[in-house]
Swiss-Prot record:
GO terms for molecular function: sucrose transmembrane transporter activity; sugar transmembrane transporter activity. It comes from Oryza sativa subsp. japonica. Pfam families: MtN3_slv. Residues 1-9, 66-72, 127-133, 189-192 are extracellular. This is Bidirectional sugar transporter SWEET14.
Amino acid sequence: MAGMSLQHPWAFAFGLLGNIISFMTYLAPLPTFYRIYKSKSTQGFQSVPYVVALFSAMLWIYYALLKSDECLLITINSAGCVIETIYIAVYLVYAPKKAKMFTAKLLLLVNVGVFGLILLLTLLLSAGDRRIVVLGWVCVGFSVSVFVAPLSIIRLVVRTKSVEFMPFSLSFSLTISAVVWFLYGLLIKDKYVALPNVLGFSFGVIQMGLYAMYRNSTPKAVLTKEVEAATATGDDDHSAAGVKEHVVNIAKLSAAVDVVKTREVHPVDVESPPAEAPPEEDDKAAAATAAAVAGAGEKKVAA
């Protein structure tokens, strides 16, 4: 790292800044997991973003180890591996049995199976610089596939004309992170680090533009499939919060070459349509409604 700071002082500066931003982003889910710990329940939140984040960090550590002078990638992704492992462990402690089984299977499939296959193929079928090229394009492909995720958020914002699921601070931080890591990759002449962040920067700018466009708009009464699916099972508040948390998780994953995180969110109230009363209950319902209206009128006058 000392050699890098002397030969590429600007690269070292941007890499260090990227480490700081990414580390803060890794710590963003702490309020969420504090809630999980206090309530002894995962509250409908999903484990997928954390498993994918761990896989991403593992990939970039392997890539950095194959190259020289990539200490800055190793440090931040090593920290990411530790933090994401802790998040997943906490999730497994408090998740219901079905969610535990799903998370365990996902870990075995992605972090053991897929990563093991990549490790085996790159070690056996390639060598030297060719191995770095193959793994570099694997990392780029994974990053690009993750960058598709913000499209669902952008579509949701356009459909609902609401920026509830896309806070400006999040979009801004993702854009800055993408710029920093792009400059780092550009200065060290590593296209595999730089290229994915061009797409990340583009999506960040689009999201900030949509925020400026819809921040004062009246949201449409559109119930998305994601929220409908969440509220179909379990508590409305916790399930809706889980959907929002998952959306934010995936958006953050596309911020930098090694980052996928969450932020604390507040539950979204999603009201279910009232069940239609039987015909024989019409008179009772009408009477109850009249009484409620009268009571409300009395309170208003008293106020």
